[in-house]
């Protein structure tokens, strides 16, 4: 990494113009390997002919030698089309090397954005906080802010989009023409490959073999979708922000600046609609939430501008039905595995003034989060832990494992699920999921040993109970021994948010 920074420090003002030569450097692929992505080809060599990590450097050197050859990419494309279903070595090497290049290319295109982020944090003197990376850090923010809001908009980022738009988005940041041509080559290659397997598959669906590159493109696309929100929010702010000028100096292409100028001039006349200091925006992956303390008319104006901006900027129908406006007091929204709502609690207070007494009704708002059982059962059914109705079944593909591995896998899933959903105010859904996983584990062991479930439950009842006893339950049993029994029966309503969760639970991610 130091060598990479030294290369870029030679000419920081023109660092975005010399990204393509980095593709011929061996340390770029080593750096991609060190990132530790599970989808990396270096971590899954079994899918590519049984190569191990020791031979990765040899493959990288062989790849660099081939890239120096003239018309290498043209030959690789022809080989991939001719031998796609034959299974010849030519197709194997072309497809394998193409994935290696995409891994290295993903590292290269991240360089300008990473350096810009680091310099921005240093300039604004923003301390690095790993706790803010936690998914659970979103919910305390919602509890503090959304309980005072009136309306909420559920926004689904529009898709699919044309592949050329993805290239054009990066063109405003990276002006290295060979790199953009290479990106276009990757997109069309994998689009043609996916179209032969599933004709209706869009480039929006990420390839398992190139997750890093496609996640980067998707994040770039989402940041462009949020451009209107950031632009209007900063325009309507009472105090001008220091980073506002960066958005006006952006380079736009193919005449689309004309649409933006028209929209910007039109926005100047309607900015009074958006002068709302209580506007809050939260997004995770493809779903966003926009909350406001204003009126329903203001939320409709926001929706209108979102739809028009996306339609003009991306030249496709932006699907207005993907934005739903609801009154927060009468609406529960599903976000990251939690069903959240604002509860209104009323309490009667008796006031005494001299000889007169009267009763006042006081209403308080509380942000509540619960775990819905139906999505969890549906997700568990997809993972083959239970039926659609929630009846536990055996995990047949795990019967070849040892008993210890089977119990550890089920226990780890149960602990992760309880850990992620520890912020729920009601624990009945978690206890039911724990029962499903525990009985599914017993059925898997019974199927492996060709025995009955009852015999295994009698033999391993205490062991399974300890394995499925979660960490927070153990802590609560030590701190509050008297309430542990109530907690196990679902009466404990204390919510716990963890600031070390940077990855969503697999059962929630399948929804």
Curated annotation (Swiss-Prot):
Pfam families assigned to the protein according to its UniProt record, in alphabetical order: Intron_maturas2 (PF01348), MatK_N (PF01824)
Keywords for the protein's UniProt record, in alphabetical order: Chloroplast, mRNA processing, Plastid, RNA-binding, tRNA processing
Principal location listed in the UniProt entry: plastid
Matching InterPro entries: Domain_X, Maturase_MatK, Maturase_MatK_N
Subcellular compartments: Plastid, Chloroplast
GO biological process entries: mRNA processing; RNA splicing; tRNA processing
Gene Ontology MF terms: RNA binding
CC annotations in GO: chloroplast
Domain of life: Eukaryota
Similarity field: Belongs to the intron maturase 2 family. MatK subfamily.
HAMAP family tied to this protein: MatK
Function as written in the Swiss-Prot or TrEMBL entry: Usually encoded in the trnK tRNA gene intron. Probably assists in splicing its own and other chloroplast group II introns.
Name recorded for this polypeptide: Maturase K
Gene: matK
């Amino acid at each position: 990494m130091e060598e990479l920074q030294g290369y870029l420090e030679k000419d920081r003002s023109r660092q975005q113009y010399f990204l393509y030569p980095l593709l011929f450097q061996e340390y770029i692929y080593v750096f991609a390997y060190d990132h530790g992505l599970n989808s990396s080809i270096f971590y899954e060599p079994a899918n590519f002919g049984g190569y191990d990590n020791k031979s990765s450097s040899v493959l990288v050197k062989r790849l660099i030698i081939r890239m120096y050859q003239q018309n290498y990419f043209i030959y690789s494309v022809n080989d991939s089309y001719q031998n796609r279903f034959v299974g010849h070595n030519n197709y194997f090497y072309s497809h394998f090397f193409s994935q290696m290049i995409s891994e290295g290319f993903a590292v290269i295109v991240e360089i300008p954005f990473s350096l810009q982020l680091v310099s921005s944090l240093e300039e604004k003197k923003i301390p690095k906080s790993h706790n803010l990376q936690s998914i659970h850090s979103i919910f305390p923010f919602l509890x503090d802010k959304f309980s005072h809001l009136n309306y909420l908009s559920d926004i689904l980022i529009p898709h699919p989009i044309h592949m050329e738009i993805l290239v054009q988005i990066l063109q405003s940041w990276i002006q290295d023409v060979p790199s953009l041509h290479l990106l276009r080559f990757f997109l069309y290659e994998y689009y043609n490959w996916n179209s032969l397997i599933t004709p209706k598959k869009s480039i929006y669906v990420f390839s398992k073999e190139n997750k890093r590159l496609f996640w980067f493109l998707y994040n770039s696309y989402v940041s462009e979708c949020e451009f209107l929100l950031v632009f209007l929010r900063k325009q309507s702010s009472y105090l001008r922000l220091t980073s506002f000028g960066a958005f006006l100096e952006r380079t736009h292409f193919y005449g689309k600046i004309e649409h933006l100028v028209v929209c910007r001039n039109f926005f100047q006349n309607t900015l009074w609609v958006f002068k709302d200091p209580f506007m809050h925006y939260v997004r995770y992956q493809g779903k966003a939430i926009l909350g406001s303390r204003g009126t329903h008319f203001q939320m409709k104006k926001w929706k209108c501008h979102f739809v028009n901006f996306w339609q003009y900027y991306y030249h496709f129908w932006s699907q207005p039905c993907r934005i739903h406006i609801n009154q927060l007091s009468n609406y529960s929204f599903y976000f990251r595995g939690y069903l959240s709502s604002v509860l209104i609690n009323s309490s009667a207070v008796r006031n005494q003034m001299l000889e007169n007494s009267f009763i006042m009704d006081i209403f308080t708002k509380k942000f509540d989060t619960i775990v819905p059982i139906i999505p969890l059962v549906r997700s568990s059914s997809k993972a083959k832990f239970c039926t659609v109705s929630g009846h536990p079944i055996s995990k047949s593909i795990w019967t070849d494992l040892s008993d210890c591995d089977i119990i550890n896998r089920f226990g780890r899933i149960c602990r992760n699920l309880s850990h992620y959903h520890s912020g729920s105010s009601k624990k009945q859904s978690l206890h039911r999921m724990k029962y499903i996983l525990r009985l599914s584990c017993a059925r898997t062991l019974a199927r492996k040993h060709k025995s009955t479930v009852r015999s295994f439950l009698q033999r391993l009842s205490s062991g399974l109970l300890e394995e499925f006893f979660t960490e927070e339950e153990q802590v609560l049993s030590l701190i509050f021994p008297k309430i542990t029994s109530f907690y196990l029966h679902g009466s404990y309503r204390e919510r716990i948010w963890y600031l070390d969760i940077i990855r969503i639970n697999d059962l929630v991610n399948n929804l």
